Amino acid sequence: DLKASWYYPFPDYKFPMTVYSDGYLPAKGELNRTEYNFDRFRLQLFQESSVYDTLLDNDLYPQFANSFLLLIGREQPEIKTLYAKFSNERDRHFDIRTEISGTESGEKAVRKYPETEEASEHISRLEKISLNLSELYKKSGISVNKCKGGKNYAEFEFLNGITLEEKLDTLLKEGKTDQAEELLFTYTDMVK
């Protein structure tokens, strides 16, 4: 009895920055970094991010993804990688990989791993940074995601909800620019 897992590297399979799966597809507006194409000159004849948003709105992204990886096997791991993002365009001290993993029961977790020796120190400090930020912002109404350190990784709880970016995008799309501006400045004032 074979089982299959589908993965979708983005922007392509040669230089993926992010890898999605059927268990974690991109959100609308997330596929906006399409300038990475190192193997040949490329003309951009249309706004690709708008096309991706249309595909996502119609649940068609897997059928039109630029590339895919299909893993087939008899056994599936207990903890399955649903999403991976590589932050290798940063300074080597912050060159990390973020993974979202899930279990059969639907539980999800977020882990950050160092991709370089220099980034290990950054990962080891994330738990303390999380605690310090929680203390700093506790009176502001901002909750900081809980972090616990592991052996060469930092784990965060997976949170469901609407991001500030998604809320701002919705307000702008609805033409509510005054509300979007007010919301943005409310948050910038909170984190000053």
Give the predicted meaning of each segment:
Residues 4-93, 97-99:
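Rossmann-like AdoMet/SAM-dependent catalytic core
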Residues 1:
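Conserved catalytic/acceptor-binding region of the Class I
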Residues 151-163:
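Conserved short submotifs of the Hanks-type protein kinase catalytic core
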Residues 126-141, 165-192:
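Conserved kinase catalytic-core helix
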Residues 82-132, 167-168:
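ATP-binding glycine-rich loop module of kinase domains
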Residues 12-14, 117, 162-163:
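Feature marks short, surface-exposed loop/turn motifs that line or immediately flank catalytic pockets
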Residues 8, 113, 157-158:
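Residue-level recognition of conserved beta-strand positions in structured domain cores
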Residues 141-153:
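Short beta-strand micro-motifs within the conserved protein kinase catalytic domain, predominantly
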